[in-house]
Amino acid sequence: LGSWLGHHAGTKVSAIIGFDNPITEDRLKALGAGAASTGSVGLFHIVGQTPEAPTLDAICLDIPNTQTLAPTAQDLRLERDRLSHSSSDELDCIAVGSPHFSYPETIALLDALQERKSIIPFYVCTNRFVLTKLEHEKLLIPLKAAGIEIVVDTCIAVAPILKGNGGVMMTNSAKFAHYGPGMTGYVSVFGSLSDCVESAITGKIIRDDRLWQ
């Protein structure tokens, strides 16, 4: 959705309705990162949740020539495909955490793994504060057992972490998918976190199209 917003809003400020209330910080981060990557979105409002937008009228009533857009499931599938640049099921690595993975996202990853192990490199980019909490909760042990490599205070797009001279990288980050090919030499494939996990277990690209209907 963030990638779609960036392509359609450009430099404009958007007011968004229809999100769950409250929207999680992780969803806000993903939305903002995707919109800023594919467009130049520096500000958006979520009506009823962000401070300046208690109602739609509060921010739109006196603004002329507003435009209303309603993305469909087909729009989001097309955006997913726009962020995916591989025509085969071959896969070399998984990379998540742009913006950096939070503690709740890491717990969701462990839940999705269900004690299974990735057979390809699986990078999780996060920060030192999340790492400290994972260490305290003794969660690095199951992560390492699952083949997860923790990348701290940087990301695979700007640090020489990825192995080889290219390949296919799957991610649940619109930001990674957008910038990754130009910055890493890896072809990107976009999917959900569960898609990334199932693909990591099999070593082949797997996507659940039911999520996009």
Can you say where each PLM-predicted feature lies in the sequence?
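Short, well-ordered alpha-helix to beta-strand connector turns
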Residues: L91, G147, N165-G167
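Peripheral docking tails and interdomain loops at the edges
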Residues: I156-V158, G164-Q213
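Short, glycine-/Ser/Thr-/acidic-enriched flexible segments
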Residues: N21-P22, Q49-E52, H100-F101, R128-V130, ...
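Intrinsically disordered, low-complexity segments enriched in small residues
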Residues: L1-Y123, C196-Q213
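Short amphipathic alpha-helical segments
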Residues: I107-A108, H136-E137, G182
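Extended C-terminal subregions enriched in glycine
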Residues: F101-S102, R116-K163
